[in-house]
Amino acid sequence: MARKTNTRKKRVKKNIEAGIAHIRSTFNNTIVTLTDTHGNALSWSSAGALGFRGSRKSTPFAAQMAAEAAAKVAMEHGLKTLEVTVKGPGAGREAAIRALQAAGLEVTAIRDVTPVPHNGCRPPKRRRV
């Protein structure tokens, strides 16, 4: 029996001008997802996916690299303008936004959608270092 060759489907090039950048910045990692206006993902990247491990994952530089990688793939689909939604308290928030602008994408709006509890769950105890 002949063995099947492992062929990957070629990514279909979409022609999308405007989109949304979802930046999730936690204390441990930064995840950047670029979607069209309906929320269908065009590209994504994260500090961990780029090979940053441990404490280097949570740095602004790692967030910058993740944003650049996601922007590069999304611009191949024709993406030009972005609305940015930022969620979380992490270090890579501003760095990721600046990297998207530096990659050549026009940022039209920046929205902070960090969830704020109305006194929900008890937070973790304070660290003593």
Swiss-Prot record:
Record keywords, A-Z: Ribonucleoprotein, Ribosomal protein, RNA-binding, rRNA-binding
InterPro entries per UniProt: Ribosomal_uS11 (IPR001971), Ribosomal_uS11_bac-type (IPR019981), Ribosomal_uS11_CS (IPR018102), Ribosomal_uS11_sf (IPR036967)
TM helices/strands, residue ranges: none
GO terms, molecular function: rRNA binding; structural constituent of ribosome
GO cellular component: ribonucleoprotein complex; ribosome
GO BP terms in the entry: translation
NCBIfam families: PRK05309.1 (NF003698), uS11_bact (TIGR03632)
Subunit-structure text: Part of the 30S ribosomal subunit. Interacts with proteins S7 and S18. Binds to IF-3.
Protein family membership: Belongs to the universal ribosomal protein uS11 family.
Role summary: Located on the platform of the 30S subunit, it bridges several disparate RNA helices of the 16S rRNA. Forms part of the Shine-Dalgarno cleft in the 70S ribosome.
Protein name: Small ribosomal subunit protein uS11
Gene it is expressed from: rpsK
